[in-house]
């Protein structure tokens, strides 16, 4: 039996959901299904993950058109992860280059026979830029390309069975988890100048929230990953580095999460003032970052992504029966991606 520590019990930001959720979810999912990126069985498992719910919980105050960008982005993240998780670094490099090219030329048709990721990314970005401020567009591209590059690095790590320390693991996961382009969605209607946006206190908020997301994601995904033999998880890293049990690794991760919460609150309180107009935008953005860990935590238990239809029960009891181990199928490639469901 696996016991999940309640890392978010003291977090002051409470659950909120966007009122446009159902309407926008229907539109975004219909758009995504039109690409037929997965087999019918895998598409059904994908639907249980409810990535639009994640967006609605992460962006509870977003305008309808910006929630659509958030929903489409969550779907895009997922399909990129699924397609690249089964390929080596060279193939991932090719896929990433296609996606980057599509984002840079959103109004140009994609070549025939190209992997579907290119057209999904192109359509996503062509729609997003219609309602996004110029500064948010620039920052999104910068951070999303960094995420894509980290996908290639992760594939290279897989290829050589690289082992990380906690420090190096967190360093590579900060880009790989996709939080920074997700934060860019928070500023689609904003125009925060660079000298303020990159102020140390702002950078700290993003960093601490991101590492909280890494820990929370790895705690809830550990069961599936230990069963499939996927060791790209901070709990495996902690156990190996400190030669400790799973229970001790859980406790270490929870304690570090508490430290991150305290650091976040300290940085939040130290935020300078730049005048009424800028302060209101900074406040909106920082509140959005603070909400992300809460939204992610709620989605982890409200969707079927990690616990099937038992999420609400697990959220209350914190107890998860360990799944039996199964051999990882290393022969899978993008054309036969399999999304498992619980």
From Swiss-Prot:
Q: Which GO terms describe its biological process?
A: isoprenoid biosynthetic process
Q: Which cofactor does it need?
A: Mg(2+)
Molecular-function GO term, any one: terpene synthase activity
Q: What's the Enzyme Commission number for this chain?
A: 4.2.3.135
Q: Where does this chain carry the motif DDXXD motif?
A: 93-97
Q: InterPro entries attached here?
A: Isoprenoid_synthase_dom_sf (IPR008949), Terpene_cyclase-like_2 (IPR034686)
Annotated motif NSE/DTE motif, positions? 217-225
Which keywords has UniProt assigned to this entry? Lyase, Magnesium, Metal-binding
Q: Where does Mg(2+) 3 bind?
A: 217, 221, 225
Cite the binding residues for (2E,6E)-farnesyl diphosphate.
305-306
Q: What is this enzyme's catalytic activity, as reactions? A: (2E,6E)-farnesyl diphosphate = Delta(6)-protoilludene + diphosphate
Q: Does the record's keyword annotation contain Metal-binding?
A: yes
A Pfam entry, by short name? Terpene_syn_C_2
Name the positions where Mg(2+) 2 binds.
81
Quote the record's domain comment: The conserved DDXXD and NSE/DTE motifs are important for the catalytic activity, presumably through binding to Mg(2+).
Family, similarity comment: Belongs to the terpene synthase family.
Return the protein name: Delta(6)-protoilludene synthase 8
> What organism is the protein native to?
Postia placenta (strain ATCC 44394 / Madison 698-R) (Brown rot fungus)
Gene symbol of the encoding locus = STS-08
């Amino acid at each position: 039996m696996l016991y999940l520590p309640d890392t978010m019990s003291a977090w002051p930001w409470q659950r909120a959901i966007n009122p446009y959720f159902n309407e926008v979810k229907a539109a975004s999912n219909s758009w995504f299904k039109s690409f037929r990126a997965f087999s019918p069985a895998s598409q059904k498992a994908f639907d249980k993950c409810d990535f639009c719910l994640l967006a609605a919980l992460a962006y509870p105050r977003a305008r309808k058109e910006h929630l659509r960008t958030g929903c489409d982005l969550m779907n895009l993240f997922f399909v990129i992860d699924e397609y690249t998780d089964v390929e080596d670094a060279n193939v991932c490099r090719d896929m990433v280059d296609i996606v980057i090219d599509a984002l840079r030329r959103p109004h140009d048709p994609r070549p025939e026979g190209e992997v579907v990721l290119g057209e999904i990314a192109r359509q996503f970005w062509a729609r997003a830029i219609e309602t996004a401020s110029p500064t948010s567009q620039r920052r999104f591209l910068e951070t999303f390309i960094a995420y894509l590059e980290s996908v290639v690095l992760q594939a290279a790590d897989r290829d050589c069975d690289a082992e990380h320390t906690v420090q190096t693991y967190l360093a590579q996961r900060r880009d790989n988890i996709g939080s920074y382009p997700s934060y860019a969605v928070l500023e689609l209607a904003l125009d925060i100048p660079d000298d303020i946006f990159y102020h140390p206190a702002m950078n700290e908020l993003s960093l601490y929230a991101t590492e909280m997301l890494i820990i929370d994601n790895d705690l809830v995904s550990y069961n599936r990953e230990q069963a499939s033999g996927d060791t790209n998880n901070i709990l495996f890293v902690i156990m190996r580095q400190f030669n400790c049990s799973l229970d001790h690794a859980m406790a270490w991760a929870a304690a570090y999460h508490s430290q991150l919460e305290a650091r976040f609150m300290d940085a939040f309180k130290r935020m300078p003032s730049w005048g009424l107009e800028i302060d209101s935008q900074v406040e909106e953005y920082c509140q959005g970052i603070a909400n992300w860990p809460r939204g992610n935590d709620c989605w982890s238990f409200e969707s079927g992504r990690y616990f099937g239809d038992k999420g609400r029960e697990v959220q209350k009891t914190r107890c998860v029966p360990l799944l039996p181990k199964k051999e990882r199928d290393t022969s899978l490639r993008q054309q036969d991606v399999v999304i498992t469901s619980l």
